[in-house]
């Protein structure tokens, strides 16, 4: 033991007496390792006034993906200078192993640890942040009700914020800028700085950036932005980040009695977590139905209550919502919420999607004679009941109804179309179902006519102008039986996700236009309405252009390898 201590002391003496030139060489090598390729091309977010902003709306997210992939590849190559040849060129002996074992262990310091530098978020000054906040809560929040306004305004005024809060704020501003003619030029810069910061947080292994609700909210808003700009592939990647964070934080079982409520958590914080989960749930089902993908957030394992009534949420009244299974089967809803209705119709579409996928799997195993009638009829009965509740309990749809109410009405009709399509497919394997197939075709045609009327309402909507809201008045009598009542001063906006159910309807009509002349006529009428609906990406374009981009994206999915896609020439005819 004395010899070992003497040997350690000698080694420490050698380390302390290193030549200055060797230390300088080591520092230079460390500096070179930390100089990542591409740093010279990164924008300086702190010098925004002198920054040249992009002027084209056709910027491709794919370019960002390519450059990021090259960046990672080159970074990996430079951070691993040793090859197998260099490792094996020096013979390993017992003496060398003994010497290495006797050397003191020197822990890595931040100066010798290779890590990706955290990008700087773009900073806005003056009155622009306040204006973008106001634009967000006027134009985005009615359709994407994620945030508690008072809580956000409280922490947004603080000088020191969490990284995730900064990301959320910039995601909000990105969506607000997209829907503003005045600040539209800021959207690209805000979007890129926000996604870079979010990605850096996800890649951080230091533990200094714990995962939280604000990150999920930011990813969800970024997903909505990418969908509005028809970046469908990138939107799926972004929402996938939100899915993993939700699963990691177990937001699918926020109201599990066995887990309880964390100490110190208030109603508002818990409710924002619920809303983040359910918004991701809706997006998951929309992606799944649109592309025939498996559902990630399965309803069978969800133990989280539906969002509370919006007025209760904003007024901080701790009134809990129902569980999903209870709300779906309620004959009379406890309270009316367009957001909750959207969740329910998305769930029903997800069930039909699952039945169809299960049908194909069983067919592959030779189970061609399974009885699908019971599940089909049960789903049909629930769907009819929910459509009746929507028409009987909610006020008639008009221009003053708001984007969320219009969206859920479109979702309801598209749920009928999707359900009829799936049922017809499964009924073809059984004999004696011709009458039911005819009934499903008639129901789908009727629902398509409703969608056309709903699309016609969107032709009278502005892209940037929205409803000017007067403060809503509520009474105890109708607080839980009606949505907010606003005073209409301008025509309403289009829901950020409105194109998805409309495109599903158009796709159905296109694929069945040769089945019946009725479907061909409905397709022609719907496309005429699409020509009059303005695109938020480029107001000079219409939903015909949105549909072309939709089909261009769909051709890259596995589903389009088996089914025909819409011809662009036919759309523009």
UniProtKB/Swiss-Prot annotation:
GO cellular component: nucleus
Main subcellular location of this protein, as a coarse class: nucleus
Subcellular location: Nucleus
CDD domains (UniProt xref): fungal_TF_MHR
Keywords: DNA-binding, Metal-binding, Nucleus, Transcription, Transcription regulation, Virulence, Zinc
InterPro entries on file: TF_fung, Transcription_factor_dom_fun
Disulfide bond residue pairs: none
A single BP term in Gene Ontology: DNA-templated transcription
SMART domains in the record: Fungal_trans
GO MF annotation list: DNA binding; DNA-binding transcription factor activity, RNA polymerase II-specific; zinc ion binding
The protein's role, per its UniProt record: Transcription factor that regulates the expression of the gene cluster that mediates the biosynthesis of the mycotoxin ascochitine, an o-quinone methide that plays a possible protective role against other microbial competitors in nature and is considered to be important for pathogenicity of legume-associated Didymella species.
Identification of the protein by name: Ascochitine biosynthesis cluster transcriptional regulator
Species classification: Eukaryota, Fungi, Dikarya, Ascomycota, Pezizomycotina
């Amino acid at each position: 033991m004395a010899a070992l201590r003497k040997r350690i002391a000698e080694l420490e003496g050698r380390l302390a007496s290193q030549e200055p030139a060797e230390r300088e060489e080591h520092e230079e090598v460390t500096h070179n390792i930390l100089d990542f390729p591409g740093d010279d091309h990164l924008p300086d977010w702190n010098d925004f006034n002198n920054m040249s902003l992009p002027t084209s709306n056709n910027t491709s997210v794919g370019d960002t993906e390519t450059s990021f992939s090259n960046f990672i590849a080159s970074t990996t190559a430079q951070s691993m200078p040793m090859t197998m040849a260099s490792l094996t060129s020096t013979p390993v002996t017992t003496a060398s192993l003994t010497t290495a074992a006797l050397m003191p262990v020197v822990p890595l310091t931040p100066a010798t640890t290779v890590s990706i530098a955290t990008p700087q978020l773009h900073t806005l000054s003056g009155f622009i942040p306040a204006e973008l906040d106001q634009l967000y809560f006027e134009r985005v929040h009615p359709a994407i009700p994620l945030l508690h306004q008072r809580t956000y305004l409280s922490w947004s005024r603080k000088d020191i914020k969490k990284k995730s809060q900064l990301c959320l704020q910039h995601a909000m501003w990105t969506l607000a800028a997209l829907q503003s003619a005045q600040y539209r030029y800021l959207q690209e810069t805000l979007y890129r700085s926000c996604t870079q910061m979010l990605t850096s947080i996800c890649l951080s292994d230091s533990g200094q950036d714990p995962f939280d609700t604000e990150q999920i909210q930011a990813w969800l808003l970024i997903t909505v932005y990418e969908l509005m700009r028809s970046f469908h592939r990138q939107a799926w990647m972004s929402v996938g980040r939100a899915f993993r964070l939700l699963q990691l934080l177990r937001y699918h079982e926020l109201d599990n009695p066995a887990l309880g409520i964390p100490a110190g958590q208030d109603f508002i914080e818990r409710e924002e977590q619920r809303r983040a989960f359910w918004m991701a749930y809706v997006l998951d089902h929309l992606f799944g139905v649109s592309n025939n993908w498996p559902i990630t957030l399965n309803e069978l394992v969800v133990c989280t209550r539906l969002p509370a009534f919006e007025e209760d949420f904003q007024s901080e009244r701790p009134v809990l919502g129902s569980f999903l299974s209870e709300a779906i089967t309620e004959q009379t809803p406890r309270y009316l919420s367009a957001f909750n209705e959207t969740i329910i119709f998305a769930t029903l579409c997800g069930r039909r999607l699952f039945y169809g996928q299960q049908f194909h799997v069983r067919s592959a195993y030779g189970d061609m004679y399974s009885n699908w009638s019971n599940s089909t009829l049960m789903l049909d009965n629930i769907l009819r009941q929910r459509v009746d509740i929507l028409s009987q309990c909610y006020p008639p749809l008009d221009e003053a109804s708001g984007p969320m109410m219009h969206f859920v009405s479109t979702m309801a009709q598209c749920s009928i179309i999707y359900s009829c399509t799936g049922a017809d497919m499964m009924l073809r394997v059984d004999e004696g179902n011709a009458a039911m197939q005819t009934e499903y075709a008639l129901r789908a045609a009727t629902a398509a006519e409703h969608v056309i009327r709903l699309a016609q309402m969107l032709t009278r909507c502005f892209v940037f102008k929205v409803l000017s809201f007067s403060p809503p008045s509520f009474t105890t009598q109708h607080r839980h039986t009606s949505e907010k009542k606003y005073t209409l001063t301008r025509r309403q906006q289009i829901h950020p996700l409105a194109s998805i159910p409309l495109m599903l309807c158009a796709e159905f009509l296109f694929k069945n236009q040769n089945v019946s002349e009725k479907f061909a006529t409905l397709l022609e009428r719907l496309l005429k309405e699409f020509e009059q609906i303005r695109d938020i990406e480029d107001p000079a374009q219409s939903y015909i252009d949105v549909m072309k981009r939709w089909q261009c994206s769909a051709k890259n999915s596995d589903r389009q390898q088996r089914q025909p896609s819409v011809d662009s020439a036919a759309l523009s005819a």
